[in-house]
Amino acid sequence: MKNYWSYFFGFLVFFVACEENPFFGDDKISNRSITGNVKLDKVEYYPDGYHGGVFVWAEGLGIKTTTDIDGSFELILPAANDPSMGAIVNGEYTIHFFLGNYQISKVIVEFAAGQIVSDDNTITPEGELRKIVYMMRLMGMHTTVSPEIITAGFDSNIKVDVDIASDPSEVFVYLKKISTRDGSIYTGLFIKEADSNKLAYLVDIDSAIIMREDIMSPGKNLEIEFDYASSNLSSGTYEVIPYLIVDRSDVPEGLKQAIGLGFDSFNQNYFQYPFKRTGGKLVIQ
């Protein structure tokens, strides 16, 4: 019996130690991470402005996340003792910060023996970026829906104004339209539930196609109308999102794959496309 209790308490001590650290250290094993903050150009600091939705991707590490509304983010690194995740190979890794209508920002971090290599300029030993990541805007987009609030008995068209601001002298985009001798007829709207990515209605014209168009500085206004009665939208709050993809050659193929295949399609996959936009509220009472 004495030997039994000796073995039992020996096992208990070993089990507790393993829960703390496999090498009987003082610190508990926890998920390692890289943290930081992002500030968007032409957006006020939080809480006056929102910096959420920035796509953060660590190239070569296979991890990604998005920023919270205050611009903060956390990339969870694989645990050092988790063989299923694979070891982090020694070397430098690039963290990409992406929005479709902002310039890509990058931070390079280094790993050695599976650990973050800290330095005085980039990252702390705890994995916190020492500087705020700033992202410069390529173009802005604000959507105005008229009327914004639909009451009982309304049976007219809903008008959507899309104001595009081009920060460089020229930006090329892809959008849905019909080209005629008299000009262009624009279409291509997603109407989704405001509190989810559930698609409620698509505004489209059968003969419209996705076409490339240049947006000269200072910008352009697009007008799109659709028949409210045919939408059959139920009571609720919605967000109206114009289909628009910024034409750019600086996006790595791996970054596109990390976002999700088909993000540039005119369907619900478009909701995967990280893009900073404002407005678009539609309330049906």
Segment roles from a protein language model:
Residues L61-A79:
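Short, acidic Ser/Thr/Gly-rich low-complexity loop/linker segments typical of extracellular
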